[in-house]
């Protein structure tokens, strides 16, 4: 029995050592993998629209940097990761990404050390629950405790800072366009076609300024990212600190105005009703102008719309400098005028004004298709 004891101890030690080795290898390739099984309600998220793209042949090779080896993830369906996110805030066109594209902070992109390029992932802000889809098109970050580097647009959508922990769940796109992977668990991705019905915009045209142009606005507004609304109690400045999805969307056909509609309008209406009851020849002409004056006040907003003054609001931030920078970048990118308007503690970023609502709707389409930006039409003040 004494001679067999060392053999048993050695065997047990080998088993323990093998178990430790297996755990270490698993942590290097997969961090907290989660199956793409939904056990709760399904939510719709927006962001970069996933589409099938062949892998970049030069950006998906294992490599070394600063003495550390990086192995490209071969099976994203078994990958999931959580950690701190960095914010890549370089100027547009100042850097070339690993995919060969010029870096653009206005795009919903991200850099990751080992995920395939190009690929897509669902990024979740673990502090507030916000989720968006980003396109992985670059490598990094290196030499830090960060697990992913987000573009400025993606960071603003998630409302992240340099101390925010996020979760990375890859989305796999098949050649037929079907989506799968950990990033699709309890999630559906909003398609751009849902937000861009061209026929309603064309039919709105130059027709009635009060009813016909309002229909495209109703079609566009439902895609505003409801999942980006924070449940915290810090109030409006927090929800508006992100560049996109920050403004509160309006009901279909309603134009935004900084001035509330005067409430005491129904009171003067009773005066013209009483005036015809007396029916003297001189009293009736006097009461008619009195009735016209109160009616003109609530119609003042449609009158402004009829004059052809519309703007497209793309966001609101709490910092004036950032708001002006975004407005200038968008104005340059889309060759349209723009302005920054203060509204309480936030600064609204608006493009325009435009002479017709059809022109504003056309810009909305370009913002969504070319920059994946959500917006709404408001009346120019």
Curated annotation (Swiss-Prot):
How does the protein associate with the membrane? Lipid-anchor
Question: What EC number(s) is this enzyme filed under?
Answer: 4.2.2.-
List the molecular function annotations (GO) for this entry: lytic endotransglycosylase activity; peptidoglycan binding
Q: Which UniProt keywords apply?
A: Cell membrane, Cell wall biogenesis/degradation, Lipoprotein, Lyase, Membrane, Palmitate, Signal
Q: Lipidated positions for S-diacylglycerol cysteine?
A: 20
Where would you find this protein in the cell?
Cell membrane
Top class in the EC scheme: lyase
Q: Where is the lipid attached (N-palmitoyl cysteine)?
A: 20
Q: Which residues form the SPOR domain?
A: 304-380
Disordered: annotated span: 196-274
Question: GO cellular component annotations, sorted alphabetically?
Answer: cell outer membrane; plasma membrane
Matching PANTHER family, A to Z?
ENDOLYTIC PEPTIDOGLYCAN TRANSGLYCOSYLASE RLPA
The free-text function statement in the UniProt record for this protein reads: Lytic transglycosylase with a strong preference for naked glycan strands that lack stem peptides.
- The protein depicted here goes by the name Endolytic peptidoglycan transglycosylase RlpA
Cite the source lineage. Answer: Bacteria, Pseudomonadati, Pseudomonadota, Gammaproteobacteria, Enterobacterales
This protein's gene is called rlpA
């Amino acid at each position: 029995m004494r001679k067999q004891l060392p053999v048993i101890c050695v065997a047990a030690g080998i088993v323990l050592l093998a178990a430790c080795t297996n755990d270490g290898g698993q942590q290097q390739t997969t961090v907290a993998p989660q199956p793409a099984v939904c056990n709760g309600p399904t939510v719709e998220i927006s962001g970069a629209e996933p589409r099938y793209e062949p892998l970049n042949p030069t950006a998906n090779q294992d490599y070394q940097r600063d003495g550390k080896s990086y192995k490209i993830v071969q099976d994203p369906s078994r990958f999931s990761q959580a950690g701190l996110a960095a914010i890549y805030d370089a100027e547009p066109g100042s850097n070339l990404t690993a995919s060969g594209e010029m870096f653009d902070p206005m795009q919903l992109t991200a850099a990751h050390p080992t995920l395939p390029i190009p690929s897509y992932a669902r990024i979740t802000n673990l502090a507030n629950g916000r989720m968006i889809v980003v396109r992985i098109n670059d490598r990094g970050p290196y030499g830090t405790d960060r697990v992913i580097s987000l573009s400025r647009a993606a960071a603003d959508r998630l409302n992240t800072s340099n101390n925010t922990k996020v979760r990375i769940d890859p989305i796999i796109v098949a050649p037929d366009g079907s989506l799968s992977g950990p990033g699709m668990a309890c999630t559906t991705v909003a398609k751009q076609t849902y937000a861009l019905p061209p026929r309603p915009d064309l039919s709105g045209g130059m027709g009635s300024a009060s009813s016909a142009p309002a229909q495209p606005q109703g079609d566009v507004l439902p895609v505003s990212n409801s999942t980006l609304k924070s449940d915290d109690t810090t109030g409006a400045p927090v929800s508006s600190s992100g560049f996109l999805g920050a403004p509160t969307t309006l009901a279909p056909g309603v134009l935004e105005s900084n001035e509330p509609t005067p409430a005491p309008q129904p009171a003067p209406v009773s005066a013209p009703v009483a005036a015809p009851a007396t029916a003297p020849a001189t009293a009736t002409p006097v009461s008619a102008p009195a009735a016209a004056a109160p009616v003109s006040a609530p119609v003042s907003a449609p009158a402004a719309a009829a004059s052809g003054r519309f703007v497209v609001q793309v966001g609101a931030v709490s910092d004036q400098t950032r708001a002006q920078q975004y407005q200038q970048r968008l104005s340059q990118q889309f060759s349209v005028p723009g302005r920054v308007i203060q509204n309480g503690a936030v600064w609204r970023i608006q493009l325009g004004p435009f002479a017709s609502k059809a022109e504003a709707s056309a810009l909305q389409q370009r913002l969504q298709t070319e920059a994946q930006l959500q917006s709404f039409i408001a009346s120019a003040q």
